[in-house]
């Protein structure tokens, strides 16, 4: 079934965020055709009384005026140039971006407003915007994170059915790094019993190093209502031998105990501390100045 794209205007572009390292989020699209079985957004879709089951990702809202709205919001006297996170609730470089170019337009607005931002994506299409990312990074802090939980072919195909292959994401990491963009990798989510073996984790870290990633972080799967039901249904189809284990782990909680989580993420931390390349030296950025008006 092909996705339906709904072209709709938005009233606001920036969303205030609490309890996170960033103050604002920006999502040029709503919905995502990647349809990852573990996607945490399904939980929020269920809370909003929207489909969180297999129908999720079949209808994508395209915020056609998002760049214009963003320009107005960034132009307010009250704007403090706080960090904006792009892609917290949808992938900004899913296939629709190739046609509508809303993410690229938003990056240009952020660059023009000297506003720092970070991007989280599974989409290699981001390399198309290297020119804008370079311009923006000369004015403010810019970070791009690729989500690459595993390089295991079967795990990727069954849990991230609509995404680009992990190795193509690594190639995008290399191209961004070669262009001087601060790029890292998020191993999220790591799936207990499927992608948490030490050799699997180290494989990702070593590949990240070879591609030029300068940072890495890892999170273990968590399952809230809406996500839990869909994930377990998909697990029963693709990994039936794992269902009993996951039901025991997650039946009464969304997050695993800290000790279990640490036992999975600690090898990543140790490997990344010895394998990853150092961060680039901070660039010297010019102060923002008033642009001349063209009448």
What are these regions (language model features)?
Residues 1-33, 37-145, 149-157, 166, ...:
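Conserved Radical SAM active-site core
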Residues 1-9, 15-16, 193-295:
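Auxiliary Fe-S-binding modules of radical SAM enzymes
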Residues 69, 109, 175, 263-271:
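Amphipathic alpha-helical segments that form well-ordered structural scaffolds
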Residues 151-155, 160-162, 175-197, 221-223:
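Conserved strand-turn element in the central/C-terminal portion of the radical SAM core barrel
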Residues 114-115, 181, 213:
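A structural motif
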Residues 134-137, 173-178, 269-272:
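Surface-exposed amphipathic alpha-helices with a cationic face
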């Amino acid at each position: 079934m092909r996705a339906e794209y709904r072209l709709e205007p938005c009233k606001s572009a920036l969303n205030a965020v609490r309890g996170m390292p960033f103050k604002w989020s920006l999502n040029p699209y709503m919905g995502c055709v990647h349809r990852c079985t573990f996607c945490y957004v399904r939980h929020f879709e269920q809370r909003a009384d929207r489909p969180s089951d297999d129908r999720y990702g079949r209808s994508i809202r395209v915020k056609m005026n998002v760049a214009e709205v963003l320009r107005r919001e960034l132009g307010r006297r009250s704007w403090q140039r706080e960090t904006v996170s792009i892609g917290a609730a949808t992938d900004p470089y899913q296939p629709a971006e190739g046609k509508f170019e809303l993410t690229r337009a938003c990056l240009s607005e952020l660059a023009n407003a000297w506003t720092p931002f970070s991007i989280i994506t599974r989409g290699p299409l981001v390399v198309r915007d290297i020119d804008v990312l370079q311009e923006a990074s000369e004015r403010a802090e810019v970070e791009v994170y690729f989500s690459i939980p595993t390089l295991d072919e079967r795990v990727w195909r069954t849990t991230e059915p609509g995404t680009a292959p992990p190795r193509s994401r690594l190639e995008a990491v290399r191209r961004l790094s070669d262009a001087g963009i601060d790029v890292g990798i998020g191993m999220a989510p790591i799936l207990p019993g499927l992608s948490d073996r030490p050799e699997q984790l180290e494989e990702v870290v070593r590949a990240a190093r070879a591609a030029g990633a300068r940072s890495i972080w890892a999170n273990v799967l968590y399952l809230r209502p809406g996500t839990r039901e869909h994930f377990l249904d998909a697990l029963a189809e693709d990994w039936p031998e794992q269902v009993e284990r996951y039901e025991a782990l997650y039946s009464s909680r969304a997050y695993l105990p800290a000790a279990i989580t640490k036992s999975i993420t600690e090898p990543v931390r140790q490997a990344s501390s010895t394998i990853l390349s150092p961060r680039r030296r901070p660039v010297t950025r010019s102060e923002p100045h008033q642009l001349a008006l063209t009448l």
